[in-house]
């Protein structure tokens, strides 16, 4: 089976993945697929660091604004949506470029989790429904029975982990249809932290408070409201924190999230990282993509 070549850009938040994705899309006739679990939601633009209107006009973006904030979204949903987008992009002779930071989503797509083949989709849905009916105590008992330990336990993580364990044999044998070039962006920790702090400041200047307050007043308990960028501001709205304290909390949580992202990509995916402050960046990335696609550099 001839596999479909795709480019995947990963790295910590605020590292510049969107800008690189647009650059590659222009250079290699590509279209971008968002691999971010929060950017699927309509009306949540600033806190999710969604590509701006100008950026979306510079390159076609997929899987942005495809869910209402009241709806849930999972790795299963992402794989189904991403598969359709990849097929659509390739059918028009273009290069799929996945830009994202949600490690589980990307791993699920690239390693065949929830793809067709040996995995019985109806069985997956039935098992997920069974788990969702359990209370927290019974759900975590299932984790212990299966010798599963996960960090920062919550229901969604627990259900994902149990699904993977339940269908491990089928998933192990499920072959992905893609040949990915995984490009990792990173730099010194202080460089990344400074970029995160600057981004949070820009978000607040650009209207994050209004966006977060709308979410808090209308849908404070939905899945979308638990994303970094919103929940940190909720205490400010009820007078439990000053704006400066809430802003600092958001910066700290985002830095911690960036660290977790890097740990995930290093441990779970075969990533070769490029420093964004290197003198030959992004030319070195363009060269890697050109070699991957078997293209010659234009003279």
From Swiss-Prot:
Q: Does the keyword Membrane apply?
A: no
Region listing for Interaction with substrate tRNA, in residue ranges: 36-39
EC assignment: the record states 2.5.1.75
Query: Which SUPFAM superfamilies does the annotation name?
Result: P-loop containing nucleoside triphosphate hydrolases (SSF52540)
**Residues at which substrate binds:** 13-18
A Pfam family that the UniProt record links to this protein: IPPT
**From the Swiss-Prot or TrEMBL record, what is one GO molecular function term?**
tRNA dimethylallyltransferase activity
Question: Which residues hold ATP?
Answer: 11-18
Query: What are the alphabetically sorted keywords of the record?
Result: ATP-binding, Magnesium, Nucleotide-binding, Transferase, tRNA processing
What's its top-level EC category? Answer: transferase
| Catalytic activity field | adenosine(37) in tRNA + dimethylallyl diphosphate = N(6)-dimethylallyladenosine(37) in tRNA + diphosphate
Question: Is ATP-binding among the key words of this record?
Answer: yes
Cite the position(s) of the site with description Interaction with substrate tRNA.
102, 128
An example Gene Ontology biological process: tRNA modification
What cofactor is needed?
Mg(2+)
Q: Output the superkingdom of the source species.
A: Bacteria
The record ties this protein, via PANTHER family, to: TRNA DIMETHYLALLYLTRANSFERASE (PTHR11088:SF60)
Similarity comment: family membership: Belongs to the IPP transferase family.
Assembly and oligomerization: Monomer.
Q: What HAMAP family does UniProt report for this protein, alphabetically?
A: IPP_trans (MF_00185)
Q: What does this protein do?
A: Catalyzes the transfer of a dimethylallyl group onto the adenine at position 37 in tRNAs that read codons beginning with uridine, leading to the formation of N6-(dimethylallyl)adenosine (i(6)A).
Q: What is this protein called?
A: tRNA dimethylallyltransferase
Say which species the protein is native to: Streptococcus pyogenes serotype M1
- Gene that this polypeptide is encoded by: miaA
């Amino acid at each position: 089976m001839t596999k479909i070549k795709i480019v995947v850009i990963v790295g910590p938040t605020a590292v510049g993945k969107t800008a690189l994705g647009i650059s590659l899309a222009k250079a290699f006739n590509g279209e971008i697929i968002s691999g971010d679990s929060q950017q699927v939601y309509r009306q949540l633009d600033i806190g999710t660091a969604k590509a701006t209107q100008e950026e979306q006009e510079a390159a076609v973006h997929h899987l942005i604004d495809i869910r209402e904030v009241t709806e849930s979204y999972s790795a299963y949903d992402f794989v189904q949506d991403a598969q359709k987008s990849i097929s659509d992009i390739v059918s028009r002779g273009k290069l799929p470029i996945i830009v994202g930071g949600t490690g589980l989503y990307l791993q699920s797509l690239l390693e065949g989790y929830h793809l067709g083949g040996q995995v019985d989709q109806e069985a997956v849905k039935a098992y997920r429904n069974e788990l969702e009916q359990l209370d927290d105590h019974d759900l975590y008992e299932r984790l212990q029975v299966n010798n599963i330990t996960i960090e920062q336990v919550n229901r969604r993580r627990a259900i994902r982990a149990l699904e993977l364990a339940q269908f491990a044999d089928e998933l192990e044998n499920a072959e992905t249809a893609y040949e990915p070039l995984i490009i990792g962006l990173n730099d010194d920790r202080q460089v990344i932290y400074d970029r995160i702090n600057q981004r949070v400041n820009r978000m607040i200047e650009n209207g994050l408070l209004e966006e977060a307050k709308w979410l808090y007043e209308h849908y404070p308990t939905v899945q979308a409201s638990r994303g970094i960028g919103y929940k940190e501001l909720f205490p400010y709205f009820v007078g439990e924190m000053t704006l400066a304290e809430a802003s600092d909390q958001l910066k700290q949580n985002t830095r911690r999230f960036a660290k977790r992202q890097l740990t995930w990509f290093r441990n779970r995916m075969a990533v070769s990282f490029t420093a964004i402050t290197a003198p030959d960046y992004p030319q070195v990335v363009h060269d890697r993509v050109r070699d991957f696609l078997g293209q010659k550099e234009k003279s």
